[in-house]
From Swiss-Prot:
SMART domains for this protein: IGc2
Domain of life per record: Eukaryota
Protein name from the UniProt record: Interleukin-12 subunit beta
CDD domains in the record: FN3 (cd00063)
Family: Belongs to the IL-12B family.
Gene behind the chain: IL12B
UniProt keyword Signal present: yes
Keywords: Cytokine, Disulfide bond, Glycoprotein, Immunoglobulin domain, Secreted, Signal
Glycosylation sites noted in the Swiss-Prot or TrEMBL record: N223
Fibronectin type-III domain residues: 238-327
Disulfide bonds listed in the record: C50-C90
């Protein structure tokens, strides 16, 4: 490639269609074409422009076809289906000047496609993302499920309110080692850790946190959104250091525990309430609810005492159980 070609070897796209049509840049040289998806849909006209001072000798190719698609500084294509998406390249003198990738975002009957992630249907239908926080520090974890294993890419972004300057930082999505089984089918689980940039744990929340997961599978683009207050996704870790102490002249024992290390402090302000239950092989005793960190229970041989926690003043999720053996 000649030096003068390097200076201006970049690629631009112009969409020639009605005002409601959208084409936008997902990342450098990756563009999303939004399509209404129905039989005999006309598709969208996209004009690709290769920016170079030369007027002649430019050809166009696509990774979807081995043929030369056209010549000249521009190439007009009609994008109707996935066969029209993919990577387009403009060439001159045997050298590639630039490449750009077109991905499709489908809309059927006014609804964007949600084919990549599994609907977990809890706490309501169309719940593709689940998020939890162990405390009020502004740190939270989100996860999602998919049956797809290959040609898959995720990116995550988050913010609190549309104009909040602090923002929320999310790391890269990671694939969990273990599969998740739902309705006799196995799914891959992806998780991401997020942290609010500046937070006051004791402050009343007025703006929702929004998490957006962008998913690309082959040439398909989709996005998924979840909005929440931290207080609505709180799930404490289980109580720690469960211990049993026999009581003199009694068939009962005293079970005691401590707040989890991950819970917000001071505990006098960020208080937990607890649920205690004796679980035998064949039955479970009545649950006891209390604010203190000990209780008296009848502990039968071969039974377990288990304890879980949740926010005392706001109906958070219950933690997982912590347990200790009676034997």
């Amino acid at each position: 490639m000649h030096p003068q070609q390097l200076v201006v070897s970049w690629f631009s796209l112009v969409l020639l269609a009605s005002p409601i049509v959208a084409i936008w840049e997902l990342e450098k040289n990756v563009y999303i074409v939004e399509l209404d998806w129905y039989p005999d849909a006309p598709g969208e006209t996209v004009v690709l422009t290769c920016d170079t001072p030369e007027e002649d000798g430019i050809t166009w190719t696509s990774d979807q076809s081995s043929e030369v698609l056209g010549s000249g500084k521009t190439l007009t294509i009609q994008v109707k289906e996935f066969g029209d998406a993919g990577q387009y390249t403009c060439h001159k003198g045997g050298e590639a000047l630039s490449r750009s990738l077109l991905l499709l975002h489908k809309k059927e009957d006014g609804i964007w496609s949600t084919d990549i992630l599994k609907d977990q249907k809890e706490p309501k239908a169309k719940s593709f993302l689940k998020c939890e926080a162990k405390d009020y520090s502004g740190h939270f974890t989100c996860w999602w499920l998919t049956a797809i294993s290959t040609d898959l890419k995720f990116s995550v972004k988050s913010s609190r309110g549309s104009s909040d300057p602090r923002g929320v930082t999310c790391g890269a999505a990671s694939l969990s080692a273990e599969k998740v089984s739902v309705d006799h089918r196995e799914y891959n689980k992806y998780t991401v850790e997020c942290q609010e940039g500046s937070t006051c744990p004791a402050a009343e929340e007025s703006l929702l946190i929004e998490v957006v997961v962008e998913a690309v599978h082959k040439l398909k683009y989709e996005n998924y959104t979840s909005s929440f207050f931290i207080r609505d996704i709180i799930k404490p870790d289980p109580p720690k250091n469960l211990q049993l102490r026999p009581l003199k002249n009694s068939r009962q024992v005293e079970v005691s525990w401590e707040y989890p290390d991950t819970w917000s402090t001071p505990h006098s302000y960020f208080s937990l309430t607890f649920c205690v239950q004796v679980q035998g092989k064949n039955k479970r005793e009545k649950k006891l609810f209390m604010d203190q960190t000990s209780a008296k229970v009848t502990c039968h041989k071969d039974a377990n005492v288990r304890v879980q926690a949740r926010d005392r003043y706001y109906s958070s999720f219950w933690s997982e159980w912590a347990s200790v053996s009676c034997s």
